[in-house]
Amino acid sequence: MTEKRLQPFQRNKSLESFLAEVNADLWHVEESLLPAHKPAFPLVFVMGPLRSGSTLLTQWLANTGLFAYPTNLLSRFYRAPIMGAKLQLLLADERYNFRDELKDFGQPVSFDSENGKTKGALAPNEFWYFWRRFLPFGDIDYLPTSELFDQVNTKTLVAEFSGMMDVFNKPISLKAMILNYNIDFLDALFEKAVFIHCKRDPLTNIESALNARKRQLGDIDKWYSFKIPEYPELSRLDPHEQVAGQIFHVNKAVEEGLRNVAEHKKMTVRYEDFCDHPEAVFDQLKNKLSANGYDLDAEYCLAERFNVTRDKVTDPKIVSAYRAFYG
């Protein structure tokens, strides 16, 4: 994405340059760590549109302690995540603690975020640099799945996930929304997986996405998030209809992609239902993982509910944009 971000959201070019250097240095080590076996654990892929509650869901999954996940620390090793996983355990895992030398690494994962960005070494990260390392997308964040199989190094992609799970000895949960339009690609690569489609009331989803544009880019006229296949047509509409169409088409793509996915590998989570009764989502996911051959040996022990933000939208422009796509 090439949009000009406001100062608090701008990339740190010095950091990115140094990370590229470090990851290049580590690659020869990483290459020797790539396993040849299939993943020993299932993956949990979080799908759906922007501002649908996906960050809350990934933070919640992280807080269960039952899943490994890309952290802000691990994300810095996007070309060497197996090595990064080992380093993370060394620095932050209580098993390797010595007189609290590095205790500040072990801060609990909060439920705070800003436009999907979290704070803290062990907070969930969206892992987009890792995904983009493999995905040969251009101006539009999409290619037909047949082209992905031709161009993506799928052997290394699968091996990286397999190796990370070997290190953590847990399933991995993470956002995979960059592949909302290529669920069949992931489904074919990972025999053991659960796809969670995050959905939200469209009106509040539209309002939240518009606010994210304003917060990160300075106004609502600039496109925010992945450029989906419908971007050329949507970009000609007013901002409210752009966002309404963006959310409509992403949800449609995910629904169509999941249509051919086996029942035990998919579930839909509505943000409002999740906030009202997260334990029900935990139980459903537990059953899906069991059907994938993995039993979560734990009972639910987190919050009974979360506060729902933006429970009513009255802005006539948002309502009109919603009707243009949803009827």
Annotate each language-model stretch with its function.
Residues 55-66:
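A conserved segment at the C-terminal end of the G1
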Residues 76-173:
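PAPS-dependent sulfation machinery
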Residues 175-177, 186-211:
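Conserved phosphate-donor/acceptor-positioning beta-strand/loop module used by diverse small-molecule
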Residues 41-43:
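Pre-Walker A (Motif I) flank of P-loop NTPase domains
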Residues 47-48, 175:
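The Walker A (P-loop) glycine that initiates the GxxxxGKT/S ATP-binding motif of P-loop NTPases
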Residues 51:
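Walker A (P-loop) phosphate-binding loop of P-loop NTPases
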Residues 171-175, 268-270:
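Short catalytic-loop micro-motif centered on adjacent basic/acidic residues
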Residues 1-38, 210-327:
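PAPS-dependent sulfotransferases, especially Golgi type II membrane carbohydrate sulfotransferases
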